[in-house]
Amino acid sequence: MVPFKLTNKVPTDTGPSLISAQSVPRPIVFMDNRNNTRIVTPTLPPNQHRGISGASTALPWSPESKNTGKYIWNRVKLKNSPFPRYRHSSSFIVTNDNRIFVTGGLHDQSVYGDVWQIAANADGTSFTSKRIDIDQNTPPPRVGHASTICGNAYVVFGGDTHKLNKNGLLDDDLYLFNINSYKWTIPQPIGRRPLGRYGHKISIIASNPMQTKLYLFGGQVDETYFNDLVVFDLSSFRRPNSHWEFLEPVGDLPPPLTNHTMVAYDNKLWVFGGETPKTISNDTYRYDPAQSEWSKVKTTGEKPPPIQEHASVVYKHLMCVLGGKDTHNAYSNDVYFLNLLSLKWYKLPRMKEGIPQERSGHSLTLMKNEKLLIMGGDKTDYASPNIHDLQTSETDQGEGTLLYTLDLSSLNELCPGIMCESLHAGESFSNSLSGGFTPSKSTESENQEIINILTPRLPDSKVLSYNDIDEGAGSYSSALDDKAFERKSDREEKKPQSSKVDSSINKESPGTGIKVSKKNFPVLRGLTVDSEEYGSSSYKDTSCQKGIPKNLFDDLNLNLQTLRLEAQQKELETARHISQLEKEVQRLMVIKEASKDSNFQTARLKNLEIQKTFLESRINDLKNLLMVKLSQASKLCDQITIQNNGLKTCSEHVTIKRDIIDLENKCDVLKRQNEILVNNMQKITPELHTYLNESSCYLGKLLKSYPTSARPPSSEKDNQIYEKDSLNKIEKVINEMHETVRAKEKLHLETQKLNDERDSLRANLLDNNNKLDALRKLSDGSSKSMDLTKKAIHLSQSELEKYRKNNDDLQKEIDRIKTEQAEQDDKQEQRGAITHGNFDAFHRMKINNLKAELYMSKENRDSLKDELLALKKKLYTLEQKK
């Protein structure tokens, strides 16, 4: 691997879209042999890029505060974490099975080239992660790159990396990752490519299921900033004529930008913020592919300040912007929302509980349960070993890092009016003829987001049902459907066709249906389905492996019945169109015959009668169609009502379950307290009874001894002496009782002290066990390292023996040649001087070559000796540590 190296020479065909800025020093790459990870050593970033998340606000971590539902911010610990890393890239939305993919990024002096998969549970309260193996097509280590997800393809482009293209410039390859088969593919487009860069953004717009386009905008390379807009057709990436298209839009073009954000909504691109060559921007620009026009959006409300290195994502019809840093390198953790319909900004009220520390260079991912996931950035976010402590630590304690989630379910309450869908200044976001998706109030947020970005669909266009298509053409796929990628388009309803029919349609007999297959429809002939991928990998990661729920099976059955009705309706419509064509032909034939007989009025009357009959049949067909549609609508209403009732029941069950869990926890606490009190009472009661019994017995003895020992006083003096003795005895008894109580208290204190010492010893024992486990792991790692070192030493010794043998062979060859040369010198003394000189020159040259080979062998032998010595030293060091 070579170090980062980038020439300042830029092709002259880039035009006015390139503007100079300050250059950035280039990092150096190296290999980390310990974990087989490709790492790049860059120059140190600014101090603010390497800040530590210290005393930031956090959720309460005491065991008593278990009710975190009232917080919109929450923190989750990720044990095996790929973070911290800065200016990485991740998928902006989870997959159907709640997976997120993370690539690249920077931490301290290392640039990563690994790929991670983070999986979330259903409610987004816990996460697991695993590293994906690296293959030959995996992108090299990079930072500042851009990525997006399209169907089952995770797309990566650009970034600051050591890899150079054939012209010595930054890597300009496009990388496609199949999230099912975990394989990377590198397309090979022809013609001109966009320059490799970093700080740019890419987004997906699909005008129809057969054409998915990837848009690239902005970025920088050292002193050069970009505002060019380039598009690549992902649906044709395997075709030999696939290529990048350099657009030349009109309108109010944005300035050259880097470290901005770009999202796709309503088949348009929305660009916000970023750094220009002169300042930092907080403007919003919109690009309309249908018109190939840029426009600067005029917004209202509480607009964010100029920021860069922030993150954004689309939620319903809102563009969410989080974090970043301003012109003074002041970091932010504020959250802003732009209503893309009313073009009004809203700021999320600041709530300290659980909010992440100010950051930049992080990533933002939209989850299915109306939550945003914030990962990474310039802060370390190390987790604490205490399971209840959700504050960040300054050092890595082996417990992973913290992830942050933002709950958007109560967004309308926090920002009143934010979900308003009124259009701004008469602008319309309705569906165009080229396709697009306009969110509506009846569309669920999660599906809407997936439709707009993840797998865009064609609006109001019906795709043939299962029963209409021949076996083998059961699903649509774009050109991504092959051994590396498969992509299926969803099925939607189609508007009724008009009665105008092309005259080139072949006639069929009335009332017969047409079988729909690839042969009948050219659009199906261009589609291929990889049956192996469709049957295995595309369903490999779904939840169906655990069994299909009954309600889901019922829904699928209902949808299947609906599709069958639509297929029958399609056959009826086709037969009706054929019948219309035949009637039209009959009408024309009647007119033709009437014109021949010169009886125009009769022909006209017949024509009108035929038209009347045709219109009556058409009205009857429309009535039947209306009845079918009404029945379908009623079924859909019933289904919606059932689903709403089910959702209400589920929500009630969830609330009741939470209350039950809280009550059970409180009951457990009270039971434990009651048990402690009962145990204390049981310990104290016997002692108290014993003490009272002893006191009673002692007093009884005193009372019994008093009458027998008492004597009638003979005088007043004797009475005084007797009373004094009695008082002394009573006082002595009382003193003994006090001493007994003090001794008991002393014993109780000593018992508590011993219990505390016991708890301390247990804690020390637990710490020692943990340290022992860590030492065992270190010992295992050292043993593995020693084994690898021994293998390396053995290989080095074998190589050394090989070089020694070669050296001996060369020495023997030299001796043989010297002997032959001496013999031939004697023979050539008799020959002429010219021949003798040429022969000597030839042998001298051969001897010189052999000497050079001998010298190289000696050098290799010396280097192997040095390497062997270093390995022995390393082995000795490991043995000493062990």
From Swiss-Prot:
One Pfam family linked to the record: Kelch_KLHDC2_KLHL20_DRC7
Sequence ranges of Basic and acidic residues compositional bias: 480-496
Keyword Repeat: yes
UniProt modified residues of type Phosphothreonine: 455
Coiled-coil residues: 550-685, 728-881
Biased composition (Polar residues): 498-509
GO BP, sorted A to Z: conjugation with cellular fusion; establishment or maintenance of bipolar cell polarity; negative regulation of exit from mitosis; regulation of cytokinesis; regulation of formin-nucleated actin cable assembly; regulation of vesicle-mediated transport
Gene Ontology CC: cell cortex of cell tip; cellular bud neck; cellular bud tip; Kelch-containing formin regulatory complex; mating projection tip
UniProt keyword annotations, A-Z: Coiled coil, Kelch repeat, Phosphoprotein, Repeat
Region (Disordered) residue spans: 41-60, 480-516
Entry-annotated residues carrying Phosphoserine: 509
Residue ranges of Kelch repeats: 99-143, 153-207, 213-267, 268-317, 319-369, 371-417
Subunit structure: Interacts with KEL1.
Other facts noted in the record for this chain: Present with 468 molecules/cell in log phase SD medium.
The protein, known as: Kelch repeat-containing protein 2
Gene name per UniProt: KEL2
